[in-house]
Every structure is written in structure tokens, then in C-alpha cells.
């Protein structure tokens, strides 16, 4: 079992209280052997301040992140790597799994650094549209020509060169 839970806190008191509560709840679970096995990989991490907590969180890129602080909205603004974030003391992970409408198919093993969870947006085909006006092609044209030349894609370079000449001759 590779599941784990990680508590990052600035409070030794909270760390102790959580450890005691986990033991109490574990004893009541019908599948306590499985849960206990998952807890073998779990950690209680004491940090000096919120900055360190966020640094660790963003480096770890959790699949699920529960933020239970007084200023959880401010903290949430600093989260850059997480699959799904649960805000405040009334928002358990199980709400996201079953009822709140967010996604349950999330990036694991730190992949939240690069990927989002699967959502309806994952199945929507997107089309991008571009229009470059004369001022725009004059501004970016030389850079495009240089990049295309460096990649030895002469036709790409010429596609811009022809347009720049057409603007000059009009």
C-alpha cells in the first residue's frame, strides 16, 4: 500500500492532538489493518512557519491538500502545486471524492507539478485563433525570421519575409 497522509503544522500541540485522534479513529475502523498499513508511509512534519509549510507543500505537490488555517483563502493563493485543494475545517477530502462536484481523478506522486486533474475541460476540444495586423507582423516578424533561420526552416522564414515585403510595398 503506497497511500499516505502528511500533516504539516507549526504547532507541536496540534501535532500531538492529531496523532492521538488518528489512533483513536483507527481503533474504530472496520478495515483498520488496511488503514494502519497506509499510515506507515504517513508523516507529521513540524515547521517553523507558514512559509516553510508552503514551500514543502508545493515541493511535494499533493494529490489532495486540505488547508485548515484561520486565513485559508490567503494561504490557498500561494499554492502552486496540488491536485485538488480543500479549504477550511468543514471541507473534507471525501466531499471532493463523492459530492462537491470537483474531480476525483487527480495527479499522484507529485505529478500535480505538471498536470491537472481530469475534468470536463479535459474532453473539450480547443481551437486557437490568431490575427496579426501590420503593426504586429512588423514587431514580431524579424524574431520569427531569425528563429526559423536558426532552425533551418527556410519556408517558415520566407512566409514572414514575403508578408513584411508586401507591407513595405503597400
Question: Over which residues does each language-model region extend?
Answer:
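C-terminal core of ALDH-fold dehydrogenases
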Residues: 58-170
Amino acid at each position: 500500500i503506497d497511500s499516505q497522509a502528511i500533516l504539516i503544522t507549526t504547532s507541536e500541540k496540534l501535532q500531538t492532538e492529531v496523532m492521538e485522534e488518528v489512533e483513536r479513529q483507527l481503533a474504530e475502523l472496520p478495515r483498520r489493518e488496511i488503514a494502519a498499513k497506509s499510515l506507515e508511509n504517513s508523516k507529521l512534519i513540524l515547521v517553523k512557519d507558514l512559509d516553510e509549510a508552503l514551500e514543502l507543500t508545493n515541493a511535494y505537490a499533493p494529490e489532495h491538500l486540505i488547508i485548515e488555517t484561520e486565513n485559508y483563502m490567503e494561504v490557498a493563493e500561494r499554492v502552486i502545486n496540488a491536485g485538488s485543494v480543500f479549504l477550511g475545517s468543514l471541507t473534507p477530502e471525501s466531499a471532493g471524492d463523492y459530492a462537491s462536484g470537483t474531480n476525483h481523478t487527480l495527479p499522484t506522486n507529485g505529478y500535480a507539478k505538471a498536470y491537472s486533474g481530469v475534468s470536463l475541460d479535459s474532453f473539450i476540444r480547443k481551437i486557437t485563433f490568431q490575427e496579426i495586423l501590420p503593426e504586429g507582423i512588423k514587431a514580431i516578424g524579424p524574431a520569427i525570421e531569425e528563429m526559423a533561420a536558426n532552425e533551418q526552416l527556410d519556408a517558415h522564414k520566407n512566409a514572414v519575409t514575403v508578408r513584411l515585403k508586401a507591407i513595405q510595398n503597400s
